[in-house]
């Protein structure tokens, strides 16, 4: 049985070949093996946004923030996902949180 990292690598290959649904499938397998696999949730957020599945994109972006609450980039990525999904107030809030994390203003 492949590991989460191996499934992630397969997902990257599929994404690079233009098979985003196939990549999503491999990433879903990866996070089912390890629900704390933040990089898998991050790529799922991006792919679901690309596939116009906003609710799933936001869910996975929020999971990254939950898993890595002190990482400014996690909030930046969440902001971008919110923006791409048309949720501007939430995007602005996540951007502000990223700034606070980056500047140590918690």
Q: How should each PLM-predicted stretch be described?
A:
Residues 2-33:
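Alpha-helical segment of the N-proximal tetratricopeptide repeat
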Residues 16-28, 51-63, 85-97:
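Structural signature of tandem alpha-helical TPR/SEL1-like repeats
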């Amino acid at each position: 049985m492949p590991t989460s990292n191996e499934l992630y690598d397969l997902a990257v290959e599929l994404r690079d070949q233009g098979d985003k649904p196939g990549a999503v499938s491999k990433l879903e397998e990866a996070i089912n093996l390890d629900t704390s696999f933040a990089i898998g949730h991050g790529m799922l957020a991006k792919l679901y946004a690309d596939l116009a599945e906003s609710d799933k994109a936001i869910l996975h972006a929020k999971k990254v923030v939950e898993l890595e609450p002190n990482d400014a980039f996690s909030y930046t990525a969440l902001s971008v996902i919110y923006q791409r999904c048309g949720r501007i107030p939430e995007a602005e809030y996540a951007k502000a949180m990223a700034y606070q994390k980056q500047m140590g203003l918690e």
